[in-house]
Design a protein with these regions (language model features):
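Contiguous, structured surface segment used for ligand recognition
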Residues: 26-162
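Hydrophobic faces of well-ordered beta-strands that scaffold small-molecule active sites
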Residues: 165-169
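Bacterial N-terminal signal peptides
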Residues: 9-20
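Bacterial N-terminal signal peptides that target proteins for export
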Residues: 1-11
């Protein structure tokens, strides 16, 4: 009986501690993987227009803009072009920015999207985060009808937690010969 009382007391203490921590946050509402370092949700939403212009200033920016344009064209069927000085979506790469090499700042307003990064890697990760803000159908290789192409207005700042990326291969579950 004494052990049961101790067990019940422990369970109640755990339940009380769980209630002390908030279960939702701004980052949880956005659903980006990996979770960004800093996320501020703003009011409103960015509606992807029928004619999208993705602007850039560097060669890395051009490659990222082309990749993004190809994905958006395929899934939305919209007229997506790259180039120009001002676009609905702007990719700005500047080595003078004070952020980590692979860091970025993504600003989504009702008027447009701005991705700022120090390097092309950071801009690419910013573009990937923006794509995750759109409906999941954006990953479709064919045009998807009946989807409202909108993204929540927000301001996201992110950078990798570590300066390296890793890969783990479990040899127990992947049968590789000794040779």
């Amino acid at each position: 009986m004494k052990k049961i009382n101790q067990l019940l007391g422990s369970l109640m203490a755990c339940a009380a501690m769980l209630g002390a921590f908030p279960t939702s946050s701004a980052a949880a509402d956005i659903n980006i993987i990996p979770v960004p370092v800093k996320t501020q949700i703003q009011k409103g939403e960015f509606v992807l227009p029928q004619k999208v212009v993705i602007s850039y200033q560097t060669a890395d920016g051009k490659n990222i803009a082309q990749y993004m344009a190809d994905k958006l064209k395929a899934s939305t069927g919209y007229d997506v072009t790259i180039g120009g000085k001002k676009g609905n979506i702007s990719i700005q790469i500047s080595p003078s920015l004070k952020m980590a090499e692979e860091g970025y700042r993504l600003t989504v307003t009702s008027k447009g999207v701005v991705i700022k990064a120090k390097t092309g890697k950071g801009a690419f990760y910013g573009m990937q985060s923006f794509m995750q803000l759109l409906p999941a159908q954006v990953e479709s290789a064919t045009k998807v009808n009946g989807v409202k192409w909108v993204a929540q207005c927000c301001d996201i700042q992110d950078a990798p937690r570590f300066g390296y990326r890793g890969f783990h291969l479990d040899p127990c579950r992947h049968f590789i010969t000794v040779e």
